[in-house]
A protein has these predicted regions:
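Long, charged/polar, low-complexity intrinsically disordered N-terminal extensions
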Residues: 1-122, 135, 141-181, 185-188, ...
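Conserved nucleotide-binding/hydrolysis modules and their immediate coupling elements
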Residues: 384-482
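A broadly tuned "polar low-complexity/structure-edge" signature
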Residues: 50-104, 184, 191, 195-196, ...
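Short, surface-exposed beta-strand/loop "edge" segments at domain boundaries and coil↔beta transitions
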Residues: 42-49, 58-62, 132-137, 426-431, ...
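Structural motif
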Residues: 37-42, 67, 127-130, 424, ...
Length: 536
């Protein structure tokens, strides 16, 4: 936690209202996000109970499983979910624009530009909390390997046709959510926590109702009071006025309302199966339909407050202007979306259960690079975030007091002007340390050359920086490429554009300890044989 965030939390406690930790919105919000509010069954890991899904805040689609332990009803739920989600995703897949990307020419080994297409936009999914993101990933893992009747006519429990496809998409979204700065799959609580600091703990910030109470409390009530009421207040029947954001449910709801309703449904279904004539069957069918409606009404009552809270959170976030570099991160999301669309359409198999060593290393390297890029871009977009880096000595703002032209000592001298900067801050500088500033949206590098004279009695010494790049190819610097006296500039000690690490070897050159050469991975996946020592 940065010092700025700590101060913001202290101010929130004192004022009774959440304090902003950002002046711009650092994540892209599309015009039509798909909001998904899921519920799971207590005691059944990953068993869906119900969901509200849709892009229209006034008309959500309710999906419910009357008996979560019934495999057929769970498959019916997944089929309904596919009908609700896949058309939204596919509506973005065919709207494309021409684009170029770099690829390695197999003949020459050089990087070349290749004409391709890029989806103009991508489908965005928003869930209430971080647990919802994990549930989406779990759903994808459980669905993408399902066999349909078309795949295998002899499979004992065939899945509906579109369920495996939805599983592949949800798996992709779940994996993409692990990339720092990605906006394909967002948790509302994480979004709000990124832009506001409350006076409660990070664990309490995962309660969507309490979080919104701190950010936008009712008139005449402090955030702490509103948050406490959101967490604990119950109605006359003992149910929470602000139900959990899911996917877990409140135990009192399970015990007092849901369990009796499911038992009633089970009895009605058993009675229908035992009916001996048509009249009795019609009566039992009416009872079964009524029991199912009761369960749907209970789930709707629990889900709707969370649904409204998610949209309220999105409204608060839309009041912030979008950060300048959020578009760049969204473009990478669009490339990811387009690439997965191409893999699905080309008939590639589903994502494997476990990544091989090379794929895992590439993912980790990409996420590390994305994390560094995100931290740098947020600081460049947001003065409040930059202030936190300045307090940590990782950036500083100073005024240029003098510029002295100098040149390198190479055979072809290049301009290396010395810029003297006055600042009251204490950046962590050492001899030869590189600093960076943004010049026309791209980084310009300078080296710390030493300290200059102090400004007045007892003042901090000035900093002397040597500009090293982005001044053109001429003997004299290009106009505007060198700061002028009086310019007030933000310098950072961190790079603005992170470079990737070294390339990993091909599969044929990968050591056997990491899955190669070809065929080694399959051998490594075989379990050890069971021996008598393994049995007690």
């Amino acid at each position: 936690m940065s010092l700025i965030t700590t101060l913001a939390r202290l101010e929130a406690v004192e004022s009774g209202r959440a304090r902003p930790t950002a002046t711009v919105r650092h994540r892209r919000l599309t015009d039509r996000p798909l909001v998904l509010v899921p519920l799971t069954t207590a005691g059944e890991a990953g068993a869906p109970l119900g969901a509200l899904v849709g892009t229209d805040r006034e008309a959500p689609r309710l999906l419910a499983v009357a008996q979560p332990r019934d495999r057929d009803l769970r498959f019916a739920f997944l089929a309904e979910l596919a009908e609700a989600v896949l058309p939204h995703i596919e509506s973005y897949a065919d709207v494309v624009e021409p684009a170029e990307r770099g690829e390695t020419d197999p003949a020459t080994g050089k990087r070349v530009k290749v004409e391709t297409e890029l989806c103009v936009d991508a489908a965005q999914i928003v869930v209430p909390s971080r647990a919802g993101v994990e549930f989406v990933r779990l759903l994808g893992r459980s669905m993408r390997f399902r066999r349909t009747a078309e795949d295998d006519p002899d499979t004992p429990y065939p899945a509906p046709a579109r369920v495996p496809l939805l599983g592949r998409w949800l798996t992709h979204y779940g994996e993409r959510a692990r990339v720092p700065g990605s906006s394909l799959l967002l948790a509302c609580t994480d979004l709000l926590n990124r832009h506001w600091a409350t006076g409660q703990s990070s664990l309490e910030d995962q309660h969507l109702g309490a979080l919104l109470a701190w950010i936008d409390p009712p008139a005449g009530e402090s955030g702490a009071e509103a948050a406490l009421r959101a967490e604990l207040a119950r109605d006359a029947s003992g149910q929470l006025l602000c139900p959990p954001a899911g996917p877990a449910t409140d135990p009192d709801f399970d015990n007092r309302l849901l369990a009796p309703a499911i038992e009633k449904y089970d009895r009605a279904r058993a009675s229908l199966a035992a009916a001996e004539d048509g009249l009795a069957a019609d009566a039992r069918l009416a009872e079964l339909t009524g029991a199912e409606r009761e369960i749907r009404a209970l789930l709707a009552g629990v889900l709707r407050p969370t649904w409204d809270a998610v949209w309220r959170g999105l409204d608060l976030l839309r009041e912030l202007p979008e950060g300048a570099r959020a578009e760049d991160r969204w473009t990478r999301d669009r490339w990811s979306f387009t690439a997965h669309r191409d893999r699905v359409r080309s008939g590639e198999p589903p994502q494997p259960r476990r990544d091989d060593a090379v794929t895992a290393a590439r993912k980790l390297a990409a996420r590390e690079t994305a994390q560094a890029q995100l931290e740098a871009q947020e600081a460049l977009d947001d003065p409040l975030v930059l202030a936190g880096r300045r307090l940590a000595g990782e950036a500083f703002i100073g005024e240029v007091s003098a510029v002295e032209m100098a040149y390198s000592e190479s055979k072809r001298p290049s301009p290396r002007p010395l810029v003297t900067v006055r600042t009251d801050e204490r950046p962590q500088l050492g001899e030869g340390v590189k600093v960076y500033r943004s010049l026309d949206g791209k980084p310009q590098t300078a080296q710390f050359a030493g300290y200059g004279p102090a400004d007045g009695d007892g003042g901090a010494p000035s900093l002397v920086l040597r500009i090293t790049d982005r001044m053109g190819r001429g003997k004299e610097p290009a106009p505007g490429s060198v700061p002028e006296p009086g310019d007030r500039i933000a310098w950072t000690l961190f790079e603005h554009d992170q470079r990737g690490g070294p390339q990993l070897p091909d599969a044929e050159e990968t050591p056997w300890t990491h899955g190669g050469p070809p065929g080694g991975l399959e051998a490594a996946e075989l379990p050890d044989p069971v021996t008598p020592e393994d049995l007690l």
